[in-house]
């Protein structure tokens, strides 16, 4: 079992909480999402939009297509609710436009080098989809699957996916369960479980794109980021980890104290060139410890803060380096360069080929 907590810290208890865009009417969410635009079928399986709410007025919308978080409405310093994640406002765009917006990633999050690894003496070969590597489970990863959904109460949603033996090249049949729970203290509790009928590799994460300003046109370079990590795993020019852990000390990768994401992102640094900015795995000092945050993100514009708690050993930080304005998201807004940051809790990239790192078998 893997657990991640996304804890939102903002000005609660305001006299009024007013949506920043649109409002709930009929089957519309506070973020302006129309549930009917998510009710469809993909590969013969029904899709829908599910809404979680709490007494504090926070709202989270999730679709069972890819197990994706579609919107998160959280109050800013004035008490105004703002949507702080990127995504689409209809199922057709999620199907038509390849993306990881808000997705539950599997069977293996991040990269497996050259699309192959050895398990129990057998070489497993996977389809490659990113610079000759298998990224996020390949071109038919779980972010493009329809999960079975069960909503037992207004604050939780359970999503289940059955992946057969040989699915996308991976050995063993796997049943995965993702449970989203919205707490009364404005935390999204994400729990992952996976069971397999034979040895295989599994690495699950959530791929939400956060923009805590609540304005998806506003770059995230002014966001203050803190990461509880003394080391990170450097990559080559194809984004594949080099198999070692380097110290963050004296480098642009040192976020042990709060620092603006943009403070050093344009530094003359080989790793920043290789990643086109930050797109790296940090080695968490909090591994296995849910009592202290692994990362913290604060928007000076909205005052909204996000704390990430996880029992995973790593976190991939990606700052929207490849967003270029060609994709239009919710409300027709184009998503431009570096207008979001992803905080993907995980095991280290390419772990199946790195026996020195925590096992994913």
Give the label of every model feature segment.
Residues 1-9:
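Bacterial N-terminal signal peptides that target proteins for export
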Residues 9-19:
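Bacterial N-terminal signal peptides
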Residues 21-361:
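An exposed, glycine/acidic-rich loop-and-rim segment of catalytic or binding clefts
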């Amino acid at each position: 079992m893997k657990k991640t907590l996304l804890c939102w810290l903002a000005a609660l208890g305001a006299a009024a909480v007013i949506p920043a865009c649109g409002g709930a009417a009929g089957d519309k969410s506070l973020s302006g999402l129309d549930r009917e635009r998510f009710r469809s079928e993909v590969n013969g399986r029904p899709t829908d939009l599910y809404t979680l709410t709490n007494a504090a007025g926070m709202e989270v919308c999730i679709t069972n297509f890819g197990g994706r978080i579609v919107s998160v409405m959280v109050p800013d310093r004035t008490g105004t609710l703002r949507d702080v994640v990127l995504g689409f406002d209809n199922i057709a765009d999620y199907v038509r436009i390849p993306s990881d917006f808000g997705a539950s990633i599997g069977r293996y999050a991040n990269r497996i080098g050259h699309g192959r690894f050895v398990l129990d003496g057998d070489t497993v070969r996977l389809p490659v989809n990113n610079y000759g590597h298998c990224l996020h489970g390949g071109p038919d990863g779980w972010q493009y699957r329809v999960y079975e959904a069960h909503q037992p109460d207004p604050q939780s949603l359970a999503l289940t996916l059955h992946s057969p033996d040989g699915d996308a090249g991976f050995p063993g049949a796997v049943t995965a369960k993702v449970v989203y729970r919205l707490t009364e203290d404005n935390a999204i509790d994400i729990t992952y479980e996976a069971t397999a009928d034979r040895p295989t590799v599994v690495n699950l994460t959530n791929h939400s794109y956060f923009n805590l300003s609540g304005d998806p046109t506003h770059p995230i370079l002014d966001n203050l980021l803190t990461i509880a990590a003394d080391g990170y795993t450097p990559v080559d020019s194809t984004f594949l980890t080099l198999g070692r852990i380097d110290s963050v000390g004296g480098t642009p990768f040192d976020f042990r104290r709060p620092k603006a994401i943009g403070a050093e992102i344009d530094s003359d640094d080989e790793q920043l060139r290789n990643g086109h900015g930050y797109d790296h795995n940090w080695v968490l000092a909090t591994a296995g410890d849910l009592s202290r945050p692994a990362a913290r993100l604060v928007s000076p514009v909205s005052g909204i803060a996000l704390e990430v708690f996880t029992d995973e050993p790593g976190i991939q930080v990606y700052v929207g380096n490849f967003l270029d304005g060609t994709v239009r998201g919710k409300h027709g807004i184009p998503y431009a360069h570096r207008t979001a940051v992803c905080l993907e809790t995980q095991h280290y990239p390419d772990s199946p080929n790195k026996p020195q790192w925590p096992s994913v078998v």
